[in-house]
């Protein structure tokens, strides 16, 4: 029963934070929906902020675990193909549960003042972790037989921009972007890099 209650608190809080934002969500609303007293929530989480960051970290750790599960790519594959494959895998992950990305996006677009600095620091940490994993997956990145190690961060940033654009389009239009569209956009985008 304990895990069930904790799960209900977690998923209800996730939904309320996603729908209403951090500031408009309060412990009373969570208690009412879950059917528990505030003391039950405080048994599992120290505060609303603690609960919020538990959800935030859970989502990012799930994403990092997914990224770590992607196999290292052959070093002879061109950078363009490696980055495209990673982009497709990321899109697949986002599509599997778009609400997680909506939660993260909302946190970063509308960060509550009282926790904005913590959100920024956590974001920097998780992006650095993601970039390390991406570099590991890619092995020795090459493009046109030149090592581009010194410029790889620029490539990663540019790829992240395209990924963010595609994610934004999926969230705002509520339509999954198909592989054909991603492929066309990728070809255009990569040539502009």
Tell me the role of every PLM-derived stretch.
Residues 54, 69-97, 152-159, 182:
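Hydrophobic alpha-helical connector segments
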Residues 53-59, 66:
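Alpha-helical DNA-contacting segments of helix-turn-helix folds
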Residues 64, 68, 113-143, 153-157, ...:
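Amphipathic alpha-helical packing segments from all-alpha helical-bundle domains
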Residues 95-117, 168-172:
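Amphipathic alpha-helical segments used for helix-helix packing
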Residues 8, 16-50, 54:
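Helix-turn-helix
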Residues 15, 19, 36, 47, ...:
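Conserved amphipathic alpha-helical interaction elements at protein-protein interfaces in regulatory
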Residues 92, 132-139, 157-193:
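C-terminal peripheral helix-coil segments that are non-catalytic and often amphipathic
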Residues 4-5, 9-12:
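N-terminal positioning helix adjacent to the helix-turn-helix/winged-helix DNA-binding module
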